[in-house]
Each structure stands twice: as C-alpha cells, then as structure tokens.
C-alpha cells in the first residue's frame, strides 16, 4: 500500500486562491506538514467566472484556460516544494481536484467538469498526479459530490458525540457523522459565493473582510424570504450544486423585485441566507452536539455568530479547535483521496452521493520513472 508524502491541490468555487497542502499519509494517519495559498491572477479568475455563468467561448479559448490552470497548479506545487526544500522524488503523488467550471449531476446526461490539465502538472513538477475524482461517481448514478465527507469521517468521527462538519467555501456542504448511522452529506446551498460576488461588483473587494459590510447593514426580510423559496433548499438529499446555479445572475433575478436597497443591507441579507439555509439543514438532519466549521466562511465572524444563535444547544467551533486547519481541509482531503486511489481503495460514499456502489475514484497521470 502506497504511503509517504502526498500533496493536495484545491481551487474551490470561491476562487480565492489555490490551496496546496503537504502531508504524510498511510493507513493509520494523516499528518499535515505544510501548506500555502497561491494567488489566482485576476484575468484567470474572471475567465473562470465567465464560463461558470454560461458565457460562450471557443474551443481554443477553453483549451487555453485548461492549460493555464494546469500551469498555475504546477507553479503552486513547485512553490511549496521550494519552500520545504523538497524534490519531486520526495513526493508519492499529487491529488489535484481541478477547477470546477460546470456541475450538472442530473438530467439526461449527468456530468461534471473540472479543468486544469493534469498533464501540465506532471510535466512541470515531475510528480505523479491523481485527478478527475468526481466523474466515476456520476457514472455510477451519484452526484459526484460532496466527496469530502468520507475524509471527515476518517478523521473526525466520534464514538458517542453527534458531530457534523460544515465546509463553507463558495458552496456550503455538510457532513453528517452520527454514530450508528451511515455517513451523510450534501451541499446546503451558497456559502461565500453570493456574498463574494456582491461585494466584488459593488466595492471591488474579493470578499467582505471580517464581515464589515454585512455587519453595517440590516437584513432585508422580504428579499431573504424570496430567496429562501428557491426549490433547491427544499430538495431532499442526495443533492449538490455550484456556481452554474447560485451565481450573480441568480442574485440579480431576486434583486429585481427589491430595487434601490443599500448595498450593505444586501450583503447582510446574503450572510443571513447562508446562515439560515445551513442551520435549517442541520436541524432537519436531526441536529448535532458539535458543528465543526472549515473553509473560508469559518473566518467570517458574523456567519459564525449567526450559526451559534440559530443552533442553540450546539457547540459551533472551527476544525482548528481539533487540530485541523480549516483553510486546508479540502486540499488535505484530495491528498488523502489520491492515496486511496493509488492504494486501490474506494473514495466515495454511496450514502452521501447516491452512487450505486463504492468505487475507486480518479485517473492516474504517472510521472516518468
């Protein structure tokens, strides 16, 4: 069974940077050794945002974006190797999620698309890459997401305490770690995505630092109620979503009914939308004693305070409190999934994704010997 140093690479729907994590992984433990966040150039970020919102582009433009992202991921890995004074031979493999540009797991031909050419990463780092993690699960009738609950269960499940893990990235997803029950998990809806999109358009800021804008505003209750009527929120699990659904266009359609509002009030309403949709799903899933939060949203003091207020009787903490950096959780998960793929072990959980069976995930792009 393969064991040793692995690297995980994650560029999520928030597009707030490429997260790269170095860890030692074997069948008994996952030990994080180092991490860094690598910036995404503004032009590249905008190109991804455009395609995620349905903007048409030529096959040439699509191919160029795929190559550019692959090179970006390789640069991020090489920066971590240099920082840690490591060589390619010191790493077993890279687990690279890629950049999701479309996720449509239902319909006549279900599909998901992550780009960032893994061949570029192999060529530029000299390290074997495991990628394309989601499509096998979809081929077996699953949602292809979320995949991280399996990792959450391996690291954070407790024999007696009812626990849930909440990742608040662009999309928020919940892992249900309830003793005596199959592991559950699904996307609850928007996490940071709409908040980030709004403040970017209104103030040119990539995110609402320390929730300053949202805390200066007041929730627009009619707007909140209008958004909560979206059918996704009442859809039963398994379910998953992404930027192709919850995007700036979705927000604009709701705002048409409420013109002229203070931008800070809209920001406050979007923060409340994220908090309410998450807390409702926690309660509908039976509640928990401890909710452990990771992802960029765990650094949002307003979100954390609202979750605690909406979930009385639940201890709301970050995963940092149990020794796992909330900023690095997803990248670490894909390093772990790469280890499982090379070990020939399944990486999905049918109880989470709805797939017909467990399966080994991903495709392997081997480095030259």
Swiss-Prot record:
Q: Where does ATP bind?
A: 12-19
Q: Which domain of life is it from?
A: Bacteria
What are the cysteine partners in each disulfide bond? none
The protein's UniProt keywords, in alphabetical order, are: ATP-binding, Carbohydrate metabolism, Kinase, Nucleotide-binding, Transferase
- Return the protein name: Anhydro-N-acetylmuramic acid kinase
Chain's role: Catalyzes the specific phosphorylation of 1,6-anhydro-N-acetylmuramic acid (anhMurNAc) with the simultaneous cleavage of the 1,6-anhydro ring, generating MurNAc-6-P. Is required for the utilization of anhMurNAc either imported from the medium or derived from its own cell wall murein, and thus plays a role in cell wall recycling.
This protein's species is Escherichia coli O6:K15:H31 (strain 536 / UPEC)
Q: Which reaction does it catalyse?
A: 1,6-anhydro-N-acetyl-beta-muramate + ATP + H2O = N-acetyl-D-muramate 6-phosphate + ADP + H(+)
**The gene coding this protein:** anmK
Please name the top-level EC class of this enzyme.
transferase
Entry keyword ATP-binding: yes
Task: Return the CDD domains for the record.
Answer: ASKHA_NBD_ANMK
